[in-house]
Every structure is written in structure tokens, then in C-alpha cells.
A protein has these predicted regions:
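A short, acidic, amphipathic alpha-helical segment used as a generic capping/interface helix at domain edges
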Residues: 85-87, 213-232
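Short, flexible loop segments at the rims of nucleotide/cofactor-binding pockets, characterized by
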Residues: 76-81, 208-215
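Short, flexible loop segments at boundaries between secondary-structure elements
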Residues: 121-150, 190-193, 250-271
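Short Fe-S-cluster ligation motifs
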Residues: 1-8, 222-247, 267-271
Length: 271
């Protein structure tokens, strides 16, 4: 399909020449990013690719299942949500992987870990599931990778996506990464599970028909939070948040770039 062709072209572009040999089956890790982290914001995927290359870890992606976003969850269609999820599980089994790593997408991780795995939709699975933030934070804590924070010298902050922070309790892991990778990390107030929503959650960020509401009402508190930090970069591990925050910064004429947590790893990792 055209989607598969597009994915293959982009993955070819963002990987080094010596990394372009496809791993089809038997890889240790199966990486499932949101499509935005391949098509729009590849730096996040490139950050993980550098880690895997450095440590000699075998990993793969699928041209059949390459978007961790689950649109059944977005639209409230439970049957579609489970069907979408099952396709990824069948692909993971076909690839004979040992670990599944959902990328910087909180609602994808919420479905894989807290809905599918814990409720055993498909019974016991022959692989474990840990999101990319847990994976990288664990490597930093063990000293397996080294980051040069001087390569990210400008003030940065972290936005807690609702699904990661409130629904899944992933709060400390991204901060471990950001503090190790950035020379000037600044915290929002409030933060963690009490951080303000970006104003574009639940797919609202895709609705430009209500742009004025999103920019001036739903996103008002988040804009104020970012401004108070003085940061010039906001890490937001969520495709919805990235779009909403990018539009907020443009609308309010703030010179702030939006990206992912692994964008900082991509810059800072010592190979």
C-alpha cells in the first residue's frame, strides 16, 4: 500500500546506511511508535535508533502495524479498538519478538499495557510490554548509555500528556531522561499527574473547526505554564499534544519549539 511504501522510504532516510538491513523475524524488540514520530517528528525515532545501534540491540518495526495510535479508542468504538489492538498482537507473534516497545504515545501504551495486557484480552502473551520512556530511563539509571547535556544547552521543559501522567503513572521516567540529556531543565507548575492538559486531548487537537476555543480557552492554562518556565523547547511525548502545543505557540507568537523526549536523546547521546 502507499502507507507501507511511505514508511519504508522514511525509515530508510532516517537510518544510517549500515543499519538499513531489515530485521524481519526474531528481533528482541518491536518498536511501535505513533505515526507522527516517523512521518512528522522522526527525531524521536532516531533517538531510539541511536540507542539500539550503540548497544547492539536487535529491533524492528512493521510496515503493516506502524501507528500505535488506536482510533477505536478515540471514537469510542470498542469493537474497532480491540480489532486494531489484535492486529498488533498478531504481528508481534509473527515477528517472534521478545519485547514490545510502544513509542511516545500515552494512549497507545494505556491500551497495550493497562487494558489489553492486564485484562488479558488475548490471554498470556509471549512477550513483555514497556514503553520507550521506561526503556530509556532504565538504561540511564544503569549507566548503560551516556548523555552529554551540554549538547542541549537551552532551557527546556516537559509537558505531561494526560494518558502518560494521569492514566499510566509515567511521571518520573521522562524527567530522568530530560535531566540527563539537558543542561537547563525547568519544571512546570503544577506538574506530574497534576499538570494541565494541553487542551487538545482525546483527538480534539485534530479539530480545526474549533481552533479559537482550543487556542484561547482549552489551551490557555498550558500556554501560561510554558511562558512561566521561560523554556524554548517543550518535550511532549504525544502526537495530539505536539500538534496542539505547536499551534498554541504559533497562535500566541511564542518562540518555542515542540518535540519529543527522545529528540533530546538524539542530540545528547555519546556514541
Amino acid at each position: 500500500s502507499r502507507n507501507e511504501m511511505a514508511l519504508k522510504v522514511i525509515v530508510y532516510f532516517v537510518t544510517a546506511p549500515n543499519e538499513r538491513e531489515a530485521v524481519l523475524k526474531g528481533a528482541d524488540y518491536f518498536y511501535v511508535p505513533p505515526s507522527g514520530d516517523v512521518l512528522v517528528n522522526p527525531e524521536a525515532t532516531m533517538g531510539l535508533a541511536k540507542i539500539m545501534h550503540l548497544l547492539g540491540i536487535s529491533w524492528t518495526m512493521s510496515s503493516k502495524c506502524f501507528d500505535g495510535a488506536n482510533y477505536g479508542l478515540f471514537t469510542g468504538d470498542d469493537a474497532a479498538m480491540k480489532a486494531d489492538n489484535k492486529a498488533y498482537i498478531e504481528e508481534a507473534k509473527r515477528l517472534k519478538i521478545k519485547h514490545m516497545i510502544p513509542g511516545e504515545c500515552g494512549h497507545a501504551y494505556r491500551i497495550f499495557k493497562y487494558m489489553m495486557e492486564k485484562q488479558q484480552w488475548w490471554g498470556d502473551l509471549p512477550f513483555d510490554i514497556a514503553n520507550v520512556l521506561e526503556f530509556t530511563a532504565g538504561l540511564i539509571k544503569k549507566g548503560a548509555i551516556k548523555l552529554d547535556k551540554i549538547r542541549n544547552p537551552n532551557p527546556v521543559t516537559y509537558h505531561d500528556p494526560c494518558n502518560f501522567g494521569r492514566s499510566c503513572g509515567i511521571v518520573e521516567e521522562p524527567r530522568i531522561i530530560m535531566k540527563a540529556a539537558c543542561a537547563d531543565y525547568r519544571e512546570m507548575t503544577p506538574s506530574g499527574s497534576k499538570n494541565w492538559c494541553c487542551g487538545g486531548g482525546g483527538g480534539l487537537s485534530a479539530m480545526d473547526t474549533i481552533l479559537d476555543f482550543r487556542m484561547n480557552v482549552a489551551g490557555k492554562k498550558k500556554t501560561e505554564q510554558i511562558k512561566e518556565t521561560g523554556a524554548t523547547f517543550v518535550a511532549a511525548p504525544c502526537a495530539n499534544c505536539k500538534r496542539q502545543l505547536t499551534q498554541l505557540m504559533e497562535h500566541h507568537k511564542m518562540d518555542v519549539k515542540i518535540g519529543g523526549v527522545h529528540d533530546m536523546v538524539f542530540n545528547a547521546i555519546i556514541l
